[in-house]
Regions:
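Conserved alpha-helical substructure of the radical SAM core
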Residues: 1-103, 111-118, 278
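Short cysteine clusters
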Residues: 14, 18-21, 206, 224-225, ...
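Structural recognition of alpha->loop->beta junctions
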Residues: 44, 91-113, 150-179
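Conserved strand-turn element in the central/C-terminal portion of the radical SAM core barrel
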Residues: 110, 126-158
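C-terminal accessory region of radical SAM enzymes
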Residues: 127-132, 158-201, 226-276
Length: 280
């Protein structure tokens, strides 16, 4: 089995405390270079693309340069999701790597930085010469622009000298091209799943275990990138071989269930993101 991508949580530490990001009691840590090397060696026959996040701010990793050097050493394509606050300070590092294939910037992050938009947009303009940039905004409901979304769009219009009709495009479309290699993606805000109460919903599917799996900072392997608490732990990358994990009873049950449009786990039944995407 091969996956289109595997999520690796290189740190679960963040420099912000956004209200839409769920809280947990996990030990705050980052993967050591030795641990990251082990992870890459164990997954390289299963994917060639990795996302350097589940929770946490990946650019906060104290050995970011060395982390990216390891991804280059093992020929991985890398995609990064960031809140953007550290982009300017990490620009020189990010520019070194041709294997970074996309940077997603969550513009909806809650920060008090006076020059946030200016610094993010100017830095991304430089990065976009070689790396696709996707700005992301979260909407409250039914793709309607709230106050913060409107502020973000106004700043985009101002910086990129966009026509005022751009606002209508944002309202009507999910994905908009701003300029070469720079895009805006919008989606409804979702709740991180942690409800494991049973309910009557038993029909549905998802891409977890099918297109991807995730590895948390403590090594726990989970079915999807939203199981940040390791509720559906399948194994541990430092203790188990991935081949064995993918043959485990729980993995096969979840995987076959999604193929059959059947929800086999309570976490999946209560996943707000999955419901928005697949139970429309």
């Amino acid at each position: 089995m091969r996956f289109s991508k595997i999520y690796i949580e290189i740190t679960n530490i963040c420099n912000l405390n956004c209200s839409f990001c769920s809280k947990d009691n996990r030990l705050k840590k980052e993967l050591s270079l030795q641990e990251f090397d082990i992870v890459l060696k164990k997954i390289r026959q299963y994917t060639n693309t990795i996302y350097l996040h589940v929770k946490g701010e990946p650019l906060l990793h104290s050995k970011l340069l060395e982390i990216l050097e390891l991804t280059e050493k093992y020929n991985f394509k890398v995609k990064i999701t960031t809140n953007g606050t550290l982009l300017k300070s990490k620009l020189n590092i990010l520019q070194k790597f041709t294997n970074i294939k996309q940077i997603n910037v969550s513009l909806h992050c809650e920060n008090n930085l006076v020059n946030y938009f200016t610094d993010v947009f100017n830095t991304c303009d430089i990065l976009a010469k070689n790396i696709p940039i996707v700005y992301r905004i979260w909407l409250l409901d039914n793709y309607k622009l709230d106050k913060l979304s409107t502020i973000i769009v106004d700043n985009l219009i101002s910086h990129y000298k966009l026509d005022k009709s751009f606002l209508n495009k944002v309202i009507k479309k999910k994905n908009i091209k701003i300029k070469d290699n720079i895009y805006l993606d919008k989606d409804n805000e979702f709740k991180w799943p942690d409800n494991i109460q049973d309910n009557e919903l038993d029909k549905g599917t998802c891409l977890g275990t099918r297109s991807h799996i995730a590895i948390l900072v403590n090594g726990d392997i989970v079915p999807c990138c939203l199981d940040s608490k390791g509720i559906l732990k399948l194994g541990n990358i430092f203790e188990d071989e991935l081949e064995d994990v993918l043959k485990s009873e729980l993995f096969l049950k979840i995987n076959q269930g999604f193929k059959d449009n059947k929800l086999t786990c309570n976490l999946c039944k209560n996943c707000n993101f999955r419901i928005m995407k697949f139970n429309k």
